[in-house]
Amino acid sequence: MYWIINDNIEFWPEHRKLISVHNADLNVVLTTPASRCLSLLLEAFPDVVAQQDFFTRVWEEEGMRVPTNTLYQNISIIRRGFRAVGDTTHSLIATVPRRGFKIHNDINIQNHVINSSTDAHTHNAPPAIKVNAGYKESIGGAKNFNNKILKHIKSHLIMLSAFVIGAYSAYWLWNNNQPKPFFKDYKTVAEINGCHFNVTEDTIDGLKEFDKYKTRILDSGINCKKHPWLYFPLAKSSPGMIVMACNKNYNQHEVANCLTLSYREVNRD
């Protein structure tokens, strides 16, 4: 099953992926909580999804309790994903004060269910092959014989060229359609007590602030055995800090099972 949003964006919940309908090269992989939040919004459309419903369905059923700010961060991740792959200049998600969030009423939402048996038949069907009726017998001597040989060689060369071009095109398309990891610009700068600390490459020069962030994270009681991969920016301009804690390396696993941690007033210490 997948969704088409406003005729511009495909959302595949199973793969947590947003894809441009018009350009498959534009695609984004959402975090697990953000993907669950978007699924709730689409299933409830055009109704409002209450904040408590998000907390219950996305986090509490997984045994986690998170602050309200974590919900807002995941809605922000969805909005950024929409802007990255969709031909839209306005927000598709509306904030309903003191209630929750919803998809705007004027947005076109379509739910598509894939017929696996039909797809399997389509993909497994053998390619159609055109067979020539054959060569007419010729009565000529060596000249006609040579012409037949040349025709056979030419035909085989054309088939070989078409195969090589097709194989190269398939390889190029496969490589360019791979999802772009959400944390592809993050680098591991330290491994402490089983936790891998990853920051954006453009903030590595600010590592003098790293000890303060590291201490705050470790003191919060993070379980490094369950969520050993930590991703966060070293942004001094923000009073708080958002950390994505995953149980697998996000850049090597499409499903990394991440949760969002929010720390307030980190840069006011």
Swiss-Prot record:
- Give the GO terms filed under biological process for this record: phosphorelay signal transduction system; regulation of DNA-templated transcription
Asked if the Swiss-Prot or TrEMBL record annotates the protein with the keyword Transcription, the reply is yes
- Keyword Membrane in record: no
Q: Which Pfam families match?
A: Trans_reg_C (PF00486)
Question: Recorded GO terms, molecular function?
Answer: DNA binding
Q: PROSITE patterns, from UniProt?
A: OMPR_PHOB
Task: Identify the keywords attached in UniProt to this record, alphabetized.
Answer: DNA-binding, Transcription, Transcription regulation
User: Where's DNA bound on this chain?
Assistant: 3-105
InterPro entries, sorted: OmpR/PhoB-type_DNA-bd (IPR001867), Sig_transdc_resp-reg_C-effctor (IPR016032), WH-like_DNA-bd_sf (IPR036388)
Write out the similarity annotation: To V.cholerae cholera toxin transcriptional activator (ToxR).
| Protein name, UniProt field | Uncharacterized protein YqeI
The organism of origin for this protein: Escherichia coli (strain K12)
